[in-house]
């Protein structure tokens, strides 16, 4: 009987260990700097993306998105997303995770970047578009309005209008 209880305990702890082993966006487990971004955008389904956001992406994703996707200083990305610089830079230095709210803002940048890539078919053009003021955003840059869901919705709408040939 003790053996069965022991086995039961082992199997009860096993799922937790498996869950802990799942890599999160920004972690070294997913490989090279671009691999985690690529996986989040292209290979993770909506439920896995949700899990990644709720568990918190690794803070290092901020550095990767700023430098490797958008070609902007980290401070520019943080300001655009309305994230506190000192807190996020500390999390990056300590290799900590972002909060779900912080991760959600980063995810919005990734979603918009992917959509901009679909429109412009070029990473450089997509990144530049996200940094240019737009009349339909009251002169703000798309990157500056991704700190809220309504801002994200507006930027997504602009890109969808381009895709479908409706004046933007």
Locations of the language-model features?
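Non-transmembrane "mature" sequence context
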Residues: 1-168
